[in-house]
Amino acid sequence: MDLKHTLRDLCMNPRHTRWVAPLLILGDAVLCALIIWKVPYTEIDWTTYMQQISLYISGERDYTLIKGSTGPLVYPAAHVYIFNILYHLTDEGRDIFLGQILFAILYLATLTVAMTCYRQAGAPPYLLVPLVLSKRLHSVFMLRLFNDGFAAYAMWVSILLFMNKKWTAGAIVWSTGVGIKMTLLLLAPAIAVVLVLSLSLGPSMQLGFLAVLIQVLFGIPFLQNNPAGYVSRAFELTRQFMFKWTVNWRFVGEELFLSRKFSLALLALHILLLGLFVATVWLKPSGSDLPSFLQRLIQRRYRTASLSKSFIMTAMLSSLAIGLLCARSLHYQFFAYLACATPFLLWQAGFHPILVYVVWVAQEWAWNTYPSTNASSLVVILSLAAQVFGVLGNSFSRKHLDQSSQKEHLQ
């Protein structure tokens, strides 16, 4: 009986995360070394990154003319600056082994920040175990060397900064992440709500302007040459994705997948879900409904709210999950953003620990199925839906976010 109680306490008591997390990270570091040693590297985009950087170093500043063997440069300027550094560190991209080591360090840094967020949000230790067991996540970082690793790191650092009320630093890091890959724009709705709740409208708009200014500063070398070309390539919102590479909507069939009606339906669903979350989940700390909140905000009668760390983390990760659920096409590297978010969102959905692990295993299987199938893509959608609608439904049933806040004060 004592053993059962001890094991339960070890798994459920947030106080244990302070020592469980370092042990898991240490074990994962060993696993990373084994993966680099034993599992062959797979070339996908690394060579293209290096070819594009070579053109940049040679003086090319027209984004439309920077290309590689697998296509044109389609990422914002911060991506160029980061991989310019990697280009020089890895002997123009030829030292793949060193590149893998650098990405392993990046992976462990991302994992460390994510676990810190979990601990500060009062999450139980059993949620940390899935964070170190994702085959696809290890692959994205160490075997594929995708730029998503840097964007995911920026995402988690910004979440941690926002959780600790470091608003300006959080906005800077988040905008830097957007400058690596546009995926981080999916967090923008939640960030806007969190900032307005915490700072009111004026200061929030100033931080929004700062985030935009950072993008302009990153892009200056390219904006001076061909501004339209830079914006259209780096921030292209109408890009068409090939059906054969999709991870999420394969089960709907190629004809529907490529149709404009399907694209518009997903956009409408995205807007609807964001509206529901704003009205029912994200505005809860304000103590008022959406019309009253907007009225007080416009009339400058709104009193700022003190947001719990768990609330901020839940808002930002649920905004991410909503965007991924409604995305027309997800590729395997998008798992860099989702992998560490899923256990926390399932917990905030109020799911039993066993169900948390069941959904996590199903999602992991789906994202490791290559090429994707009708079944695996359906599971991708269902697992994302479980996270989104789980958090939404739990906000109606009980004050789970408030309970999480209370746990923080007990730590």
From Swiss-Prot:
InterPro entries named in the record: Glycosyltransferase_ALG3
Keyword match Glycosyltransferase: yes
Disulfide bond sites: none
Topological type in the membrane: Multi-pass membrane protein
Keyword NAD applies: no
Transmembrane segments: 19-39, 70-90, 96-116, 140-160, 182-202, 203-223, 262-282, 307-327, 341-361, 376-396
Biochemical pathway: Protein modification; protein glycosylation
Residue intervals annotated with topology Lumenal: 1-18, 91-95, 161-181, 283-306, 362-375
Cellular component per GO, a single term: endoplasmic reticulum membrane
GO molecular function terms listed in the Swiss-Prot or TrEMBL record: dol-P-Man:Man(5)GlcNAc(2)-PP-Dol alpha-1,3-mannosyltransferase activity
Alphabetical UniProt keywords: Endoplasmic reticulum, Glycosyltransferase, Membrane, Transferase, Transmembrane, Transmembrane helix
Superkingdom classification of source: Eukaryota
Compartments, as annotated in UniProt: Endoplasmic reticulum membrane
Functional description taken from the UniProt entry: Dol-P-Man:Man(5)GlcNAc(2)-PP-Dol alpha-1,3-mannosyltransferase that operates in the biosynthetic pathway of dolichol-linked oligosaccharides, the glycan precursors employed in protein asparagine (N)-glycosylation. The assembly of dolichol-linked oligosaccharides begins on the cytosolic side of the endoplasmic reticulum membrane and finishes in its lumen. The sequential addition of sugars to dolichol pyrophosphate produces dolichol-linked oligosaccharides containing fourteen sugars, including two GlcNAcs, nine mannoses and three glucoses.
Family that this chain belongs to: Belongs to the glycosyltransferase ALG3 family.
Record protein name field: Dol-P-Man:Man(5)GlcNAc(2)-PP-Dol alpha-1,3-mannosyltransferase
Organism the protein comes from: Neosartorya fischeri (strain ATCC 1020 / DSM 3700 / CBS 544.65 / FGSC A1164 / JCM 1740 / NRRL 181 / WB 181)
